[in-house]
From Swiss-Prot:
The encoding gene: nuoA
Chain ranges passing through the membrane: 7-27, 63-83, 88-108
Complex and partners: NDH-1 is composed of 14 different subunits. Subunits NuoA, H, J, K, L, M, N constitute the membrane sector of the complex.
Gene3D superfamilies reported in the protein's UniProt record: NADH:ubiquinone/plastoquinone oxidoreductase, chain 3
Organism: Burkholderia multivorans (strain ATCC 17616 / 249)
Family membership noted in the UniProt record: Belongs to the complex I subunit 3 family.
GO molecular function: NADH dehydrogenase (ubiquinone) activity; NADH:ubiquinone reductase (non-electrogenic) activity; quinone binding
Protein name: NADH-quinone oxidoreductase subunit A
Places the protein is found: Cell inner membrane
Catalytic activity: a quinone + NADH + 5 H(+)(in) = a quinol + NAD(+) + 4 H(+)(out)
Top-level enzyme category: translocase
Keyword field: Cell inner membrane, Cell membrane, Membrane, NAD, Quinone, Translocase, Transmembrane, Transmembrane helix, Transport, Ubiquinone
GO cellular component: NADH dehydrogenase complex; plasma membrane
EC number: 7.1.1.-
Length: 119
C-alpha cells in the first residue's frame, strides 16, 4: 500500500496544528494581561450577578441534552440514507429499518421508564 498519497493530508494537519498552537501562544505571551475582579466575574447581560455561577442544575437538563444528541444523530443518519436510497437498494433499506427499529425500541424504553416526564 502506497502511503505517499496521504503526505499532503499529513502536512496539512501538521501545519494547521502548529500554526494554531503558535498563534495562541503568541497571543498569550504578547497580549495584555491585567486581571481584575470585574473582568473575571461572569457576564449576565450587563446586570450584577444574581447568584453564584456554580449553581447546581437538575439532572433532567442533562437528560434532555443527551436525548437531543441521540435524536440529532439519528436525523444525521436519515438524510444521507434518503439521498442514497436509490443506489443502495433493498439491503440499505433493510439496514436502515433495523436501525430505526432499534432507535424506536430505545425511545419506547425511555418513555416507559419515565425519562421524558418532567415532574
Amino acid at each position: 500500500m502506497n502511503l505517499a498519497a496521504y503526505y499532503p493530508v499529513l502536512l496539512f494537519l501538521l501545519v494547521g496544528t502548529g500554526l494554531g498552537i503558535a498563534l495562541v501562544s503568541i497571543g498569550k505571551l504578547l497580549g495584555p494581561n491585567k486581571p481584575d475582579v470585574e473582568k473575571n466575574a461572569p457576564y449576565e447581560c450587563g446586570f450584577e450577578a444574581f447568584e453564584d455561577a456554580r449553581m447546581k442544575f437538575d439532572v433532567r437538563y442533562y437528560l434532555v441534552a443527551i436525548l437531543f444528541i441521540i435524536f440529532d444523530l439519528e436525523t444525521a443518519f436519515l438524510f444521507p440514507w434518503g439521498v442514497a436510497l436509490r443506489d443502495i437498494g433493498w439491503p440499505g433499506f433493510i439496514a436502515m429499518m433495523i436501525f430505526l427499529l432499534e432507535f424506536l425500541l430505545g425511545f419506547a424504553y425511555i418513555w416507559k421508564k419515565g425519562g421524558l416526564d418532567w415532574e
